[in-house]
Amino acid sequence: MIFTTSKNSSFKAEFKELLERGKMDIAHVSATVGTIIDEIKSNKNQALKEHITKFDKWTPVSDEDLKISTESMSRAYENLDKALKAALHLSYDRIKAYHEKQKPRSWFDDEPNGTILGQRVTPVDSAGLYIPGGKAAYPSSLLMNVIPAQVAGVQNIVVCTPTPENEPNELLLAACHLCGVSEVYKVGGASAIAAMAYGTETIPKVDVITGPGNIFVATAKKMVFGDVNIDMIAGPSEIGILADDSANPSHMAVDMLSQAEHDEMASSILITPSQKLADAIKAEIENWLKILPRQKIARESIEKRGAIIVTSDMQEAIDLMNEIAPEHLEVATLSPFELLPLIKHAGAIFLGHNTPEAVGDYMAGPNHTLPTGGTAKFFSPLGVENFMKKTSIISFSAKAINEIGEECALIAKIEGLTAHEQSIRVRLVK
């Protein structure tokens, strides 16, 4: 773990290295992913079955084997522990309520001369949602992807999730039933992205693909973008924390480890103007590591991609964090809302000592599918707008076209587009 201060002579180099760590290099998998996509485009279901045999260690006999039955999803839901079922329902309700507030509205504006201008917002026809499966299956990811698509009004929702050894994750199936999803396919990785982007005999082509995944999934999404829309190209999970002396060192340590336990590539960075707090957090990290079930993963992550940085003041800490533009940003300070206007770049901001990042993963309401690797400088969280499109509406009356027609025709003439010019002039009153 990098443990440093901004006053160190080597800090600029250390910080630059820290920023580079967060970037995802897809060059080494691009050729493999490109081949997978080409095989799906050419051989469709047959290629899917071959890829499932190779990567998930089971062989679909028929095309029907690719799809998970609604009966198995219903059964998984009924078998859920009562408390867990209630928790999933509460999560669903909170996520839906938040995303309902996001929904963009169509608008129209009438001008006195009879011109009508507007913007119509409508859902895409179909969406493909990729949900990681196997041991890393997260029902929360299903809720976070399905709900905004449903709120947007998408009629056809397809879910793809890998099922190693043909054993679907029961929690994931239960969440599918809770959300009312019926088209769920046992396909993962780049193969799933290609299948949803181009269609097979079983899996329909969709308009937009969303959802998290490993480097092969991220690379496939990047490659199919343009043939379909995508939400973002997300890399390993990351957390940034701004903290002052009012923060609890033990809380800060476990918050950092909440990302580190995801995988070895996850990033956890805390920046504070307090050397005392930094020292205490470093000690608490070791205490927490001793008791975590995923200690090995968390330790490797925190050692290779963790950092605690001490700055001269909070403004410098904020400036550094804006440069990082983390996926998740906790502001664990005495007056977090006073700092909020100074924070420019983050996927989601968690304000105050009682707002751990984990509450945003499951229950707060905002989406947990967030931009990573510094892309929060230009990408936004997954939301309802990812499943909607805007169409411009234009209507001119005879009076309106005559009021601006000459000026419009003049610009067309200057651009050398005679048919454009004449299509306006023929409508003008001489």
From Swiss-Prot:
GO molecular function: histidinol dehydrogenase activity; NAD binding; zinc ion binding
GO annotations of cellular component type: cytosol
Enzyme Commission number(s) of this protein: 1.1.1.23
Function field: Catalyzes the sequential NAD-dependent oxidations of L-histidinol to L-histidinaldehyde and then to L-histidine.
Protein's pathway: Amino-acid biosynthesis; L-histidine biosynthesis; L-histidine from 5-phospho-alpha-D-ribose 1-diphosphate: step 9/9
Record-listed Zn(2+) binding positions: 259, 262, 361, 420
Catalytic activity: L-histidinol + 2 NAD(+) + H2O = L-histidine + 2 NADH + 3 H(+)
Example GO BP: L-histidine biosynthetic process
Name of the protein described by the UniProt record: Histidinol dehydrogenase
The encoding gene: hisD
Family of the protein in this entry: Belongs to the histidinol dehydrogenase family.
SS bond partners: none
Organism (species): Sulfurimonas denitrificans (strain ATCC 33889 / DSM 1251)
